[in-house]
Swiss-Prot record:
Protein name: Small ribosomal subunit protein uS9
Keyword Ribosomal protein among record annotations: yes
Disordered: region residues: 1-33, 115-154
Annotated Basic residues bias: 135-154
Pfam families assigned: Ribosomal_S9
Length: 154
């Protein structure tokens, strides 16, 4: 028996995204992210895409759209944005450091859930690397970490 021919532009049986080739989401995971002086504990569970940060909605917690996008990048590149419920507990730091900590925590949680499919794209995007840059301390005799007071020759 000969299988029926498909039209060239018919993609009904072809997977549309990486999420469809993965199968059903059944596993949960957690990850710890740090950036500057911020620490984020991230818990992922299969769900409708509810994103809660310290008991508040992400839109309420991160008022800047840039910080929200930055925090959600790992889910976006894996095409899992509405697939997991995300619960985050944040401590310390400012908005930028906290967004970076959430991003690292989500990436590590996704890596623990499915390392075979998730590790390579997360690693190539640089989401599994901890950004170790921190503020340099102020030194005695200087105005800031490296800024010296104005010098007068005479």
């Amino acid at each position: 028996m000969v299988p029926p021919q498909r039209a060239k532009n018919d993609t009904s049986s072809a997977p549309d995204s990486a999420a469809e080739t993965r199968g059903p989401l059944v596993s949960s995971g957690s990850g710890l992210g740090r950036r500057k002086s911020a620490t984020a504990r991230v818990y992922l569970s299969p769900g409708e895409g509810v994103f809660v940060v310290n008991g508040r909605d992400i839109n309420e917690y991160f008022t800047s759209k840039l910080h929200r996008q930055f925090a959600c990048q790992p889910l976006k590149i894996l095409d899992l944005l509405g697939s997991y419920d995300v619960k985050v507990t944040l401590h310390g730091g400012g908005a930028s450091g906290q967004a970076g900590a959430v991003r690292l925590g989500i990436a590590r949680a996704l890596n623990t859930i499915d390392p075979e499919n998730n590790r390579k794209p997360l690693k190539s995007a640089g989401f599994l690397t901890r950004d170790s840059r921190v503020k340099e301390r102020k030194k005695a005799g200087l105005k800031k970490a490296r800024k010296a007071p104005q010098y007068s020759k005479r």
